Amino acid sequence: MRPSTSRASAIALTALLVSFGSVAAQDTTERPWSHLGPVRIRDLTPFGILRMDFLPAHAVTATPGTWALELTVSYQNTYVMSDNVADYLRAKGGGHRVRYDESDVAAILALPGEAYIVDGEIAVVDLTAHYRFTRHWGAYLTVPALFYDGGFLDSTIEGFHNLVGVGQENRELAERNQFFVVNKTKSGTLVFDGPPDGGLADPVFGARYSVVAEPKRWNLILEAAVKPAFRDAKPFVSSGRTDYGVQVSGQWFFRRQALYLSGSAVEYGGVDIEGVDHQTQLVPSVTFAWEFGLGRTVNGIIQLYSSPSVIKDTDLDELKATKYLTSLGIQGLVKTWVWRLALTENLLTFENTADIAATLSVAKVFPPKSR
């Protein structure tokens, strides 16, 4: 656990909460309120990004024949490494930042025991088409794309750490804005000394059943989905295996607030890539969210997410640790447009998750034509 990072996260989240409260205080006039549901974020961690992970169920009510197109863009920065890699970089740099090269790959692979480093930024783009067949049944198709780069956020993150007076958690050991991955565990070896080619990832087909067609106080939503492997395995793009699973979501609505709880179970087919765990496993996940009105058309959202690591074949406890993420955001409904903006931070466990992620989502609803 990295207590200084936890402190930085707490400061950032507290600042956002204060901002939300200030906005809410400016608009106390009673008016109709629209509940939208949780932020549509899936697992963004570099060690689980290829598996199918359910997006938490939205709470937008639609009539039969309604279409919707939803574009979600998430961008995350990851900088994690094992203790022996940190010791190596510290010794090599001698107080200066290291520019990764092939000699570092060889040196890390030669370290005794298991070792890993993941330094880079990942963009996840999800395009989802929704359709409502009946008052209760709907379906969706999500087509994701993944992109990798050395990025641009390292300086911003380090500056924020300095601003709030916390440590850099080994960020001072390497030059900024590089992409570098070396993973040496019992599963094998995976090496990238530059950003890999991104591209279209495996699509997800899902069906959704809403128990209450037009919910006023509560709703229960059941979903089933499959992620077929439509291509051969490709590192950081496709697992080459098929995943499938189910999700159950409870939704409770109040005057200007709503609570959401989603639980899912996914049969993860593993990854057909050398250096990554191959084993099939059942991966549960839980999302809890609180939505509250802030203004005329804007809501705030606080969201918590947890799921176990898919990495099992290692002696490094930090890679096997359960992941905990928190998201804070704002979202709104403007005519037939739904927009969401959120920041996601890691909690409790830090060595197998992204340091920070930002998500922007825009959806356009196409109601059925009146006859």
Language-model segment annotations:
Residues 23-104, 368-371:
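Outer-membrane beta-barrel biogenesis signature
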Residues 64, 134-136, 146, 212-215, ...:
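Outer-membrane beta-barrel channels and translocator barrels
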Residues 65-67, 72, 77-80, 237-312:
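Detector for outer-membrane/organellar transmembrane beta-barrel domains
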Residues 67-71, 139-141, 205, 218-224, ...:
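Transmembrane beta-strands of outer-membrane beta-barrel proteins
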Residues 72-76, 144-146, 210, 225-229, ...:
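Outer-membrane beta-barrel pore domains and translocons
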Residues 73, 131, 143, 209-211, ...:
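Residue-level signature of outer-membrane beta-barrel architecture
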Residues 89-92, 162-189, 276-371:
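Outer membrane beta-barrel transmembrane domains
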Residues 144-281, 317, 333:
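Outer-membrane pore/translocation modules
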